[in-house]
């Protein structure tokens, strides 16, 4: 009689694997927990080659961690997803997911089946989103530009630029409004990637500036070229204008030494003809990602055109999109002939080389197809400038979301406290097993105001109790429903009306983080078996099919 089927690996099942997963998730959440909120602390991460990153952006911290545990990887990917989808709320989504898992694990230990917990969580998430949309949203039309500035300031409050929040919030709002365009369906769009952020260390934060136009960190190819061109016609080339050399391996047999000179002459004429074709269309600004030989620069100087070499491909794409140009990787058409047409050119009102701060930059102003904006950041050192860039990215995304969806919710733990009270009452109305799961979901949400208070060195138990009392009153007593805007004031350590204080977050940040955290918790909760296969051993003679063939083990 044969023995049972053996699995070549380590297998853990049931409660052991669930506890393991919950512990892994909790340890990831504990890493980012202290960086949460307006008084959160920063993390210093050093990679294997010694590069240092100082940040308190949840997505960046988790991206730089090398995590082995599969359940912990789910949370790292969750933060990355929140960053890509919304741009802000990356730390809170991880903290909520870990807390949901911890409380679900407690229920499972009390012999409640994971399926009941999962269906309870799904129901609670659905109800929470409905409650936010019906009761907690504030329409931005009634608040105007102030609402955008306050949302940006709320996003920046936990970051390195929070101290100059007013200055940067106005800059961010102006930048997002500058890149606005209307798509084919008539919807306004705000492509945040069109805001070019350049960093130059030196000076203070407050000397950072917003520039109307797209800034390139390049200079003109030759001193003899004009530094300013009005009514620019821009050619975007993704190849170098250097002397054409024959490919490696090409052999030419020559009988007459004069032919060698002709070959060399032809090599230089090919590039000369390309340049003449480009200039013949009226192009007066040529941007290329490659190099331009000095001997060819004279043709541009003679034509009075501005040629810029070594432009970053990312920048070239943005310039092409903004000016309406086509990026060409070759001049050859389908027939193999080299042509360049006027339709391939982009247009801008002005291209100028200016000295801004301590650097020479090329500014492309008032492009034809779309408007663009650039922000130049100043800071004490590279670490600071990098962190400022991450902070601005979050703020830009927040302003974009507020403009697109035209609604915000109060910050400072107000939404979580309101949902916690509502879901607790909702749970008692449920007559099924889901009641316990919904109650745990409600309790899990309090981790947000709790963590905010702990990080601000306040008495979290006292503050959260007061906050819950206000929200309970708002939901029980219709006359006092304005208390639903009450959130935490972490500087003075007391509850306050966050609608009046101007602490706003985009609705989508809260809704998405709830949905993503619930889905991530459910994904990990469903796992009840973990099989880790052993790596194939090197000294196993018959480990692979090839080895078996060579050793003759397969011969009859």
Curated annotation (Swiss-Prot):
Transmembrane segments: none
Modification type N6-acetyllysine: residues: 199, 400, 494
Residues annotated as binding ATP: 37, 89-91
Recorded catalytic activity of this chain's protein: ATP + H2O = ADP + phosphate + H(+)
Localization per Swiss-Prot or TrEMBL: Cytoplasm, Cytosol; Cytoplasm, Cytoskeleton, Microtubule organizing center, Centrosome
GO biological process: binding of sperm to zona pellucida; chaperone mediated protein folding independent of cofactor; positive regulation of establishment of protein localization to telomere; positive regulation of telomerase RNA localization to Cajal body; positive regulation of telomere maintenance via telomerase; protein stabilization; scaRNA localization to Cajal body
GO molecular function, one term: ATP binding
Binding site for ADP: 37, 89-92, 158-159, 412, 505
Family: Belongs to the TCP-1 chaperonin family.
Function: Component of the chaperonin-containing T-complex (TRiC), a molecular chaperone complex that assists the folding of actin, tubulin and other proteins upon ATP hydrolysis. The TRiC complex mediates the folding of WRAP53/TCAB1, thereby regulating telomere maintenance. As part of the TRiC complex may play a role in the assembly of BBSome, a complex involved in ciliogenesis regulating transports vesicles to the cilia.
Protein name: T-complex protein 1 subunit alpha
Species whose genome carries this gene: Mus musculus (Mouse)
